[in-house]
Amino acid sequence: MKKLLNTLNVTSENSNWGLEGETIVVYDNQTEIGRLPLHNLEGIVSFGYRGTSPALMGACAERNISICYLSPQGKFLARVSGKTRGNVLLREQQYKSCKDEDISLKIAKNCILGKVYNARWILERSLRDHEMQIDSERVKKASLQLKDALELIQNAESKEQLRGYEGEAASIYFGVFNELILQQKKDFIFSGRNKRPPLDNVNAMLSFVYTLLTNQIASALETVGLDPYVGYLHTDRPGRVSLALDLIEEFRAVYADRFVLSLINKKIVNGKNFSRKENGAVLMDDDLRKKVLVEWQNKKKEVITHPFLKEKVEWGMLPYVQAMLLARYLRGDLDGYPVFLWK
């Protein structure tokens, strides 16, 4: 099993990074602010427009350490990775399966089943743990509607139909998402999912964390030899990691959404670290981004029992595990893709 390594998150907009021997050196306005050995890294995420030296970029490419460039607010800009990994036969099988309507629909259906199942689990968990603090009737109704949606998704006959059911389920889930916010309700009001740009504090955090998780999944897919740009549900588009967007679906509720809710309900974050632009976009400040990144790294180290493998695994390893299971299915080692169903 692959070992969980660190991700270097560079949040200073004025930083540059260089290479000294086997060590990354980070500079802020020509002042050294940190060092980290290459062998401890699986990726670098830069929140700024400055860059890395050619020597460091080459060293990262040789070691399969991906470099992801984001804007200061977390908008994806670019990814740099090394040589294509894995068996070329695996990618050939991936491309072939994407063109096969039956196989493609089967995999896409599993991803959405995982998404809705896990979203319903979040609601059921809230009913169990916080029934007296939430509008339990609304949440129970939404949970039952998601249960019905699972049957519709299972019987979907086309991707168009599947996307329709997915959209309806997402609307139901996010329709009661505000009930799951138990603390700081004045600062964290959620009235619906919005993005590009996010229009409230909760959506700003969700979009930020979704970007982190998408990058994590894309790196995992490349590690096992799959092409992250060729998906089953999300159509191919230049520069879009479609397969990573497929696999993130099963993780959104139990990994990303739950993480954001935890930050709010445990009062790890507050409403003071957000600002609003003239166009209504809500932005996170540097201090908040750093705090979220620290908590994200801690979350990745938490250990759970994988529901399919029945083995202990860190949350941060789940994208790699699911990518590996998808690769095994495409090779013919498994009868189906075992989507992550949290229990």
Can you describe what each PLM-predicted range is?
Residues 48-121:
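A surface-exposed, charged beta-strand/loop segment in the N-terminal or early-internal portion
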Residues 24, 31, 50-52, 74, ...:
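Short, glycine-/Ser/Thr-/acidic-enriched flexible segments
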Residues 18, 25, 43-46, 66-70:
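Short, conserved beta-strand segments within well-ordered enzyme catalytic domains
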Residues 42, 54, 58, 211:
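Short alpha-helical basic/polar micro-motif
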Residues 38-52:
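Extracellular/luminal Protease-associated
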